[in-house]
Amino acid sequence: MSDRKEFRDLATPAEAHEAIASLNLDPEPETVSLDDARGRILAERVDADLDVPGFDRASMDGYAVRASDTFGADEADPATLELVGTVHAGAEPDVFVGDGECAEISTGAVLPDGADAVVMVEKTDEVPDEERVEIRTSLAPGDAVMPAGADIAAGQRAFGPDTEL
């Protein structure tokens, strides 16, 4: 004789379907505070209310410039720009980059008004004893800039249904 259990009272397929259908496998959604949301599952899609990041930012250390000021610049014939300030990550820029100007900028810092590109520090030389920087490469608008909304744009899906928080 075997130690194996035998199940003689099996449910019919109809009974099995009825038993499964009676389970509450699709609970009603409920709203909870953010403090209580950890480990919960989203019932529906969540769209971003705002751009992330909410500003254009530098994707590397260097100088915020107007790309048009670097047109034709190269190692043999650099563009020379006036240094008008510094922008640090986490700080609001207090400088405007005008024609022929640049601002030193840290990775992740907000791009100052007037600038539309960032040149990496390795492609520059500070002019000794002057507030001027030589740019040894040409840039296009948007070079080394992460635009506002690059991670998630306002109105785009931030989280989908069934996402665990």
Spans of features found by a protein language model:
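Short, low-complexity N-terminal leaders and the immediately following helix N-cap/first helix
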Residues: M1-D74, P147
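Short, glycine/charged-enriched hinge/interface segments at domain edges or termini
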Residues: A11, A64-L165
